[in-house]
């Protein structure tokens, strides 16, 4: 049976958002949304491991550690393969004896119609966007169960809920819908020892390929602009902290109202 945090009934509400003394891992955090998440966790007092594949964030991590006074480590992990994720998790355990919060954020954009995308391209999208979350959940879930506690947050997308138009991105929609549903299933399966939630961003200004492509949707967002990645920090911090201690199986859509239309 899940138990509430020891101080949940007595703590000041702002203290519930603290990650002081907690160890966090953010997969796919070299830049963009991932680095904003890592920054939020560090600013809230959590120690952080930032994983990456191509862009080395070591210098940014050092600066973040100096600014916040917490541990900020970097680790290169290829999330597209099970053996490298398993090896990466073993390295993570050498750094942190306990792991409190894990964010599966790595992913790839994909903008091609089904008839223009051979099956191997669909398989690649699913491998990076969906299978990687399963890999992280599989290896981290074993640790959570052994510890008796854990918190997994996955980055899905509003495309898990709606069908984007007029662009044709069926493969991407399918991959993110699978992430969303996987998290809901895990929330039930792991209720005794872990909380599992997902975040579904809408159109955000990032340095991922396709940013200029996204700008054409600004007029259709009720806020009339794209989101900024720092605007996601509070959402992930809420789910990572004791402020959401009775929240599991939730998909939080952060889209400036786009899916309301």
UniProtKB/Swiss-Prot annotation:
Domain of life: Eukaryota
GO MF terms, alphabetically ordered: oxidoreductase activity, acting on the CH-OH group of donors, NAD or NADP as acceptor
Localization of this protein: Cytoplasm; Nucleus
The protein's Enzyme Commission number: 1.-.-.-
One Pfam family cited in the UniProt record for this chain: adh_short_C2
Alphabetical UniProt keywords: Cytoplasm, NADP, Nucleus, Oxidoreductase
Name of the featured protein: Uncharacterized oxidoreductase C1739.08c
